[in-house]
Amino acid sequence: MSAPTTAIDALLAEHADLERQLADPALHADAGKARKAGRRFAQLAPIVATYRKLEAARGDLEAARELGADDASFAAEVPELEATVDQLETQLSDLLAPRDPHDADDIVLEVKSGEGGEESALFAADLARMYIRYAERHGWSVTILDETTSDLGGYKDATLSIRSKGDSADGVWSRLKFEGGVHRVQRVPVTESQGRVHTSAAGVLVYPEPEEVEQVQIDESDLRIDVYRSSGKGGQGVNTTDSAVRITHLPTGIVVTCQNERSQLQNKARAMQVLAARLQSLAEEQASADASADRASQIRTVDRSERIRTYNFPENRIADHRINFKAHNLDQVLDGDLDPLFDALAAADKQARLQSS
């Protein structure tokens, strides 16, 4: 089954136009526009390459059929060429299937402790480190925008910005978008003197980050901006000035804080980026019932019973309850080895999309 010619022609024309734009030095004077064009080009590249392979295979098949009428050696090639054409048509159909429009986006990720007190905060910090190590494996940059630590060095809450450094169509969101929800841990807490296994939980929220704050309509009159003395790690002198920023979006009640940059101006800019990401997600929730259902699957209350995944330390086991994924390599997972799990989640999501289409 082949894609409509007009749709393919439009994509080929767009790909060629983007190729010309990217070759023009003038485009790269605007880093934002250049990155947007680069990401779209990267998204179209496999479609164009697969289509060209398909056209070549179709030509070979047609020639083999014609020549095979008089030459058995050409006729023998027909079944293999037919299989190649079928395979390429399936690949092209998959590439042309609607995909998440945010897959190329960077993200804002929040980790929050829940039931379990100090142990929950320590586990929240373990989750944050897990995502940081995963990002490092992929060459992504991570910035801790805000953090509130517990007495033992855990995270009551933390906000991370995770950004890719390239123009891949499969960006940070495409890999980490399934992480939103309640994560449950079973282990012996450091505060447990009797050696008993306890269960606690931490929550994760993930938002695609708009490339520009201006993409999201934010009325300055809807904001209350407070500044206060930072307790973060923003550098020398950070505790002697009111450099931390708290922004409250009055219509929604969303509160964003940022204190780890060196200046009040930088903290405000970062906080506005996080606010834009959260408002964008909220708007998409309200515009789509499916998005609302997806967001409802993220953390609403950090309740141990509402979990998407369990981390069992005594058995070195991780279990994702949405897809019945189990593995006994928890130590490696916490060190950022998440791709097998993420591949399984992406495959399940793709299958669900195909079934619903």
UniProtKB/Swiss-Prot annotation:
Lineage: Bacteria, Bacillati, Actinomycetota, Actinomycetes, Mycobacteriales
Localization (cell): Cytoplasm
Post-translational modification N5-methylglutamine, affected residues: 236
Species this chain originates from: Mycobacterium sp. (strain KMS)
Recorded family membership: Belongs to the prokaryotic/mitochondrial release factor family.
Cytoplasm keyword on record: yes
Name the UniProt record assigns to this protein: Peptide chain release factor 1
Pfam families reported in the protein's UniProt record: PCRF, RF-1
UniProt keywords, alphabetically: Cytoplasm, Methylation, Protein biosynthesis
Post-translation changes: Methylated by PrmC. Methylation increases the termination efficiency of RF1.
